[in-house]
Amino acid sequence: MSEWNEYKLSEITTKVGSGATPRGGQESYKYDGISLIRSQNVLDFEFSGSGLAFIDNEQASQLSNVKVVEDDILLNITGDSVARVCKVPKSILPARVNQHVSIVRANLTEVIPDYLLYYLLNPQFKKYMLMIASDGATRNALTKAEIEDFDIWVPSISEQKAIA
């Protein structure tokens, strides 16, 4: 068995961040275009296309800092669906996230996305995220700083592949 090392999530990712709702809110959504991922789309282990919103190229360019790429992990960070986690499906790309969803992008030299997905969805870790999200708040929420501060135990890449 290989050695496991403890890292802060920020040390094994290249991006943690959430987006915004385009100016004009729901009225500005389009019938097709660039996918805008909202919290209702993120279920545990599963992405739901139900109610997927779309924005145009101009709106997407205003959200270029939250461009979703293949293998990104999506984490709901507010409300009753806080701490739900899934991997983005390739079929909905190109995409952006709104302010209720955070992108967690694995640093592939440190951790594989599927291992990170399973780690975040482990029942004990899920319970931990829910505890943090409800701590002293009137609304469940996880901040970027809290997410980046998550302690993640990581084995070798080969062992991660065996686990995932």
Short names for language-model regions:
Residues 39-40, 78, 97-101, 117-157:
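Glycine-anchored helix-breaking recognition loops at helix->coil/strand junctions
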